[in-house]
Every structure is written in C-alpha cells, then in structure tokens.
UniProtKB/Swiss-Prot annotation:
It comes from Aedes aegypti. GO terms for biological process: axoneme assembly; cilium assembly. Pfam families: LRR_9. Residues 258-281, 428-487, 500-608, 780-810, 834-855, 1070-1107 are annotated as: Disordered. Cilium-specific protein required for cilia structures. This is Dynein axonemal assembly factor 1 homolog. Residues 500-512, 801-810, 1083-1097 have a biased composition (Basic and acidic residues).
Amino acid sequence: MVRECVEESFGPKKMTKKSIVDSCKKNKLYITPHLNDILYLNYSGYNAIESLEEYVGLKCLWLECNAISEIKGLEYQTELKCLYLQNNLITKIENLDSCKQLDTLNLSHNHITRIENCGHDILPVLNTLNLSHNYLKTADNLDHLRHCNFVSVLDLSHNRIEDIAIVKILGGMKELRVLTMTGNPVVNEIPSYRKTLILECKNLTYLDTRPVFDRDRACAEAWKRGGYEEERKELLRWKKEEQRKIRRSINATLRMRHRGDGEPELLKTSSDEEDEDKASKCGKDMSSMLEINQKTNEQAWAEVEKMFCTTPSATGSSGIFQRFATNRGGGADGDGEVIETSEEDIEATIEDIKAVSPKKLIEEISSDSDGAKENYDCKPDEVIAKPCSEKLIEEIVIETAECDSGPSSPEYHEALDKPIENIVNLTNESPLTSPSFDTEPRTLIEEIEPTDVEEEQQIEEQPAPKPLSKNMEKVMSTEKEDDTLNVLIENNEEISITMESKDGELISKVESRPPSTECKKYKIVSTNDVDNSESEPTDITNEDQEYRSSSVSVTSSTDSSDSEDLFDKIVPNKHPKLATNYRQDSTTSTDSENEVSPSKPPIKLEKEKSIAECIDEYKKFFKAAKILESDPEDESSTKMARPHTAKAKRTEPIIYEGVLRNMERNSNESKIAEARTEAKESKEKVIDRLIEQQNLVDMNLEEQNISIGGQEHDFNEYRLEAFRKDQEKLQCLIDRVTAQKDLYNAHIDQIHNQLANIMEDYDQIGLKLKKVDDFLENIKEEPKAPETPSIESEEEIPEELEVHSSEHEQEIVENDNLAQQIIEKIISQSVKTSSEDLKSNFDDSSESSDSAEEDFMDSIRPDHNLLEILTSPKPIPILDPELIPNVDNEFQRDPVYRKFIEIQEEIDKLTEDELYDIVTEATGEFSEEAHVEHCLNTQVDQYWKQYDDIEEFRKNINLDSHPIIQKFRQFIRCHCENKYPGEVDSTIDNLDKACRKLERRLSNQLFDEYLELSRKMSVATIGGESSANEIELIEVDEEENDVEDVVKKITAWVEEQVQNEIAELNEERAAHAGEVMQDTEDVESKPVEIDGTKEETVDSELADNCD
C-alpha cells in the first residue's frame, strides 16, 4: 500500500477511469463519459493514453504537458476534431487512422524526426498542423507534407531544417495559407527568403510574423521579372494608387458635405505629383495662424479700412466702406460672407464710382497662376472689349496715374472728366521692352491685330529665348487648357487667346470661335451691387484647377479645407485674419509683372507697399475671368446673391479702386529679375552640389576602406582574405574528395587482389577437373573385341613391344610360375570335391581357405542370394596375396592406378562427414560478417559485369558438372573476401585445403563410377566366349535357389576354361616373351593381352580357388 502511494505521488501516473472522472469533476464536466465532448487531461504526468473507450463523443482532447511517448488508445474517438499533444515525449506520428474528422493537431515541443501518417488518406480534413520545436532536419523528413492536401496552417518554426528543397515541398501544398518558418537555419540559406516563399506558395496570406498583402505579392513578382529596380517601380505604383484612394475617399466625404447644402460638386482633386514640401510649409504657417485667429473680425475689418482710407475722396470711398461695414459678418472661424447687391442700389453705386474715381469695382476670376510665370518672356495678356453706345461695355481699366496724386492732380481730374463708357485703356507693353506705360488707349482691333511694324519691333526687342524650367514644362504640358483666355464680346463671338511655347518663349494666339458656356468672363460690378439684398445665389463659380508649379504655392478658393469661406475673396489678402486660405511663397510672381512702374519714385510707405505686394499675389489667386453681355437697361437687374450658409457657393472677388492704383504704382521688374536670379542661383547651387558629391564619391573601391561589421577594412586586404578563405574551403573539399577517392581505390585494389587469388584457385580446380573429364572420356570408350591372331599377325610384333620385352621378361616368367601354381591348385581341389559330397566339400573348403577365400565363401553361403552378392558395392576379394605376391608391383607402375591408390588412401582418412564438418566450420567463421561480405560480393559482381559474365566464365571451367562443386561454389561465394586485409592469407589457406579435400572426394566418387562402368563394359569375348570377369555380371533368377547346381556349373566352366587358357599361355610365352602389358586399367576387369591373346589369369585363379 505504501509503495502504491509513493508511486502515485512521485512515479509516472497511469491514466485510469478513476483519474479521468476526477479530472472531469475538477473541470466541471459530466461524470457520464459519453456526454463529454471535451476532456482536459493536461498537466497530469500521464505516460500513456488509455482508458478512453467510453469517451466516444470527444471532439477536443487536451493532453499537453505530460510524459506521453506514443500516440495510441484513440481507436474509439471517431468524432475527435482537436488533439493537443504538445510538450510530451512523442517520437513518431502514428495510430490516427480512426480520427477521420481531426481538424487541428498540435505536436509541438516533442521529439519527432519525421512527418508521416498524416496525409489526406488518413486525416482527410486536417487543417492546422503545428510541429514547432521538434527535430525535423532534411527534406526527406518533410516530404510527406505533399500528401497533406487540406492543410492551410502549418507551423515548422524552431526545428533544424537546413535543406532548401523544402521550398518545393511547400510550393506543392496548394491550400497553404499560413506558414511559420522562423528559427530554422534554412531561413538564412534561401536567397530573398520572403519573396521566394511568396512566389512559390501562390495562396499564402501570412508568412512568419507578417501578413502577405497583394502589394507584397505584386512586388515579389516584379522582382522575379526584373530584379530590384522593377520591384521599386512596382512599389511606387502601389503607393501612388493608395494615395489616390485616400484622396478619393476624402473628396467623397467633402462632396457629401457640400451636397447637403444643395450645392454642386466644387471640390478640387489633389495632384498625384504634388510637392511634399507643402506639408512642411503648412506647418510653418501654423504659428502665424494662431496669432491671426486671436483677433476678431471687427478688428481685422478696421485695419483694412484704415489701409484704404489713407487718401479718402469725398464721400464715395467712405460710402463704399460704410456699405462693407454694414454687410460684413464675422465668426469665430475667421470666414467672411459674400456681399449681396440689390437692383435698387445699382444706379447709386455707379454715380458714387464716377464721383470718386474712373475705376470700377471689377469682379474677376483670375487666370491660372501659370500664366503669371509665363509672362516673363512674352506679351501681356490682351483683354478685348468693343465700344458700344447703347450697351454697357465690359472692360478692364488700368490707371496710369499714381495713387498718391490725390484728387488735386491733373491726371486725376482729367480721368474724372472722361465718361465711363469711353474708358477703354489696354496696356500691352511688356516691362522688359517698355520703360514706361503708354497713356494712350488702344482699340480692340489694335490689340487683336497689331501692325507689322509693331511685330517687327517686338521681335527685335525681345531677348534671346531661354529654356523653360522643368516645372514650367510640366505645367505647360499638363494644363494646356488653362493657357487659353476666352472672352465674349458684343456679337456673341468668343475670342480665344492661347499662350503657346515656341523656342522657349510663350506666344499668344488669338482665335475667333462661337461662344462657349465654359469660357472665362469678366463682369463690371457697381458699388450699388454691394448690398444686403436677399436675392438668389448666383451661378458664378470657379473652375477646379491644380497648381503644379514649384515656385507658386497657392491653395485655390475651391479647396476642401474647412476654414475657407467666400469672404476671403472680397477683401485683399493683406490682412491674414480675413484671408487665411493663402500660403505665401518667396518666389511668387503675379500678373502685375506686365506693368511697368512710372518715372515717378514709388511710395515709400510700408503699408502701401505691403498692400501692393498683397494685391499682386492676390491677383494670381484667381484662374478665370468672365465678360458677360448686358444691356444698359438690364444693368440694373444685375445682382449678387449671398448664400444662406457658411459653406456656400464661391463668387468672384471684388477688387477695390485703391488696390488697382497701388497695383499700377509699383512695377514687378525687380521681382522678375530677382526671381530669375534666384532660379539661376538655385540651379547653379544644385549643379555645384551634384558635382561636389560626385567628386566626393570615388569609384576606385580598391583604395577605399569599407565598413564590415562596424569595423573598417581595406578593400584589397578584405578581398584577398575572403579569397584565401574560399580557397582554403575549396582545398579542404578537394582533400576530402581525394581521400575518399583513395579509399575507394584501395578498396577496389583489395577486391582485385582477392579476385585474382580466387581466379587462381579456380584455374587450379579447372585443370584438375579437366584431367578428370579426360579420364572419364577414356573410360566411356568401349574397347573393341580382340580377334584371334593368325600366324602372320603373330610374326608382326610392334617395335615398342620389342623395345620393352627385355625389361619384362622376368616379370612374365614370374607370372607364368604363379599361373602354373594356381592351375595346379585348382585342379587338385576340383578332384577332391568331385568325390565328396557337395555340401561337406563346401564346408571343408571354406574352413581351409585363406582369409580372402573365407570372405568370398561367406558371401556365397546359402542364406545369401547370389544376385545380392554380385550386386554388392563391396568388391569381391579375388586375389590371394599368398599366391600372387607381385601383383601390386605390376599395378603400381600404372599412373592411373597410383592415382587411384592415393585418392583411396586420402578418402579412407577423410570421410564425408569430416569434410562436411570442415566446410561447416569454415562457414561458421564468417557468419558474423555475412552481411558486409554480401554487399562486397554485390560490388564485385557489378565490377566484373562490365567486362565478362561471371556465370559464363564459371560454366566454361566446368564448375557446374557435379553437385559437390555447386555446394562448394556457394561456400566460395560467401567467403571469397575478408573485411580486414590481414585475413587474406588465412582465407586462401582454408580455400586451398578445402579444394584439396574436395578433389579427393570428387576423384573417389568419379573413380567409383569408373569402376561400375568398367564392370559393365569389360565383357570381352574371343570367338563368342566370355571372360572370367563375367562372373560378376551373371544375372541369377530369383527362383533359382539351388546353390549346389550353381557351384557345379561354375566349377565345370572354370575347369574347361583353365585348360584352354594354360595351353594358350604356354604358346604366347614362347613366342612373345617380354611383351609389355598395355592399358591395364583394372585388376578385376582389364584382361592382359600378349600376342593378341587374352590372359585372364586372375579370373581363372579366382575360379579355381572357388572350386
């Protein structure tokens, strides 16, 4: 009990039903197992998953932070969707076949080395797979991901992946959306890692810690097409498109705001190429705007009135300002309201203007600001008007007198005497060509059609054309439509004055065309128009234009700023409180550049100078002008309506008479020169700065120090050091390859040596087997039956026999003596046996015979069958060593017999079991290295196949001719090589011994076969008589059981045969003494031929002994 408590407290915890129920109670789940769809078994120390058979309804199983080493025990969780096994000891993904609905599998922080068993065939709906913090390394370990067709979220972070082939594997996952690869070495190995993975994974939306937007994919594709330059261009295009979207959304919001007031769309579209410096300039003006907003509108109007009342005239100007004062309205935002006029005050206003000054208040829509800059090298814009006695002619009057001349000046009174209908003064002289103003007014035709003399003078006086700046070219190319001034005259004809560039100069062209509704117009407004009448809003609006010039930074009156209002168009921009929508630039130029200051010195009052500058800059704020036709009688009906809301329609500003005088007083010639000088200086500065930077950049990198890792390095030394390191790496690689190559060559040389030794052994075995085959072929040849020699053949003795006759005389004599003794003994025995009983004789003879005869007689006793005796493998002892003492000497001279005796002696010493034991023992010595040697044999076979077929080679040496050779060849194949070179000699010795033993055994078996064949083929007859060896081949019927009859027949046959052979032997001995016996192959079967006669002495002696 104590041990169980200790194991439960400290040892690995086992997952039991009781522990699972306790976990359910702890987490407020159901005690009934099948009612739970989620189960928390985490942080419990379990070492195996078990006892979950009853929880068949689980959909989410938490098993993290345990000691689980194997995934099993989930056979009954068929509805499982989420399985969390992180922070365990799992080494293999397995046993998930039953979880077909698994959607999320978390196996992070385990010991997994290979991804397997999670393909679409096993987990068909797997969507999320987390394998972070494992031991994945090569692409082979990750190749199974190709079969995960529905995995869209994959986490492989913090593994050991270092094979860049994983890019192709991830590219094959068509549904992959989210990928995490941080913490792997391959991240640093893949060039342009993020772009490469975005290009390979077509549907990837999130990579590592950042999302993949359409812009990232487009930039990656551009990088693939044209490198980093194409990527930069694509990124710039996307940025511009995003800016356009932002502007469109803002403009849409502003349009909705204006539409709410019942107004048309009057928003200005921002330029795509708007300078970024405007934002910084707006920031600089913020400080001044704060000071401006602190003042009230009443104070601002008071200051404006003081500016224009420095030289008041009678009651006219005061009346005007009184009207303005009564009609102005102020708010907290500094916006003014448009002054309304009434029909009743039109005539009164005209009279006031006549009394004060010949100038009229003109409502004007200024031309584009680009026209101001284009007036440097061309004629001033020509404003056209046509006099008419019945109608009010719309005109622009430019006063040539000084503003400070006062009402007492003659020019001032002369201007007062002129009727307003006859005042048409148009100044056409450029400040560059005329030192003073032309006081004579010019007619409309003179303005439109200048004389040839004037044209020639203008061409001669004009300076050499200067190239326009890039900003000017940009403006001219993008806003050609703004360079045309359309003017309506009396006969409903429209005169179009177009400014075109030619050779760096701007040339005005005048065209006559039908009137257009979109032309720019000028309109005369009397002082009576400035009234509090509540008429309907007018339809006079400004056209939306964009200011692109870098030297002019002006915000149009139709801009979408919340602080703008119509009232800033009514007053000059002198007072910033009343006109806060203007941003001043130091390089601004105006339309007043066309005017030339008179010979009188300019006014030195700072207030008046500031007013002139402000008015000059204010004139370029407008873009268009309208000249409307109106009859004198309808002039009183002309009204200006004020909108009812703060964000109302835009109306054309009204310019004061005093402002016009100040505009004429000061010339912009100095400003033009200053602007040109500044432009030239800025251009020179830019060029100098570029040249200076180019000189500072020395392209000779070899003489410069480069920064690497925060330290300076000499370029040459660093390059040499890097080259040296690369060379060392290359040399190390070459050394490794060379060492491996030497190892392979040594291994191949060793194989060659072993094969050479084996081939030598094969050659020796082949030679020996060839000798055996030749020997067998000689044995198989049937000997021809010898014929009875005639007298002539007896006389013809071969020379070889004569040569060897002397050497064998003594042997023949001994043989004759031995044959005589055998014959006499046989005859004596045959006489004795004839008188006695056959059985008793048989017993006596068997008892008194020698050891050889006893063996033979024992074999033919009545209890043995004669057929069994004759067919017995044991050879019959037919030789009596006492009677034939010198027979061995005769056969020892025969080489075949000697070989047979040697083989027989070896076979007697070494049995088949012993040979088998030797081979088995040799095989057992190499059993431990069988696998390695088998691989080596395979390499040897592959090496030799390119030269010859080894099987055909072995067949050629006749190794398959015998089963023993096949067995031994198998032994040689398994043990022909050694693992260590020192064992080669011992293996060769073992093989040599085994070959020798095999040769002996083979020779023994082959010689036994030879003996069997020789017994069957040794029936040699002379005249139809059989030899003595026929005794062994006599077939006895199984029914013949009378041994006595058989013995009688044999005895009679032997006696008759002996007598005949003795006579023939004596004759042969006398005639052919010393003849050499030839082809003596077997003692039992080969007859001895002397002079063509056949001796069968041994068989006859055996027969006599048997008798």
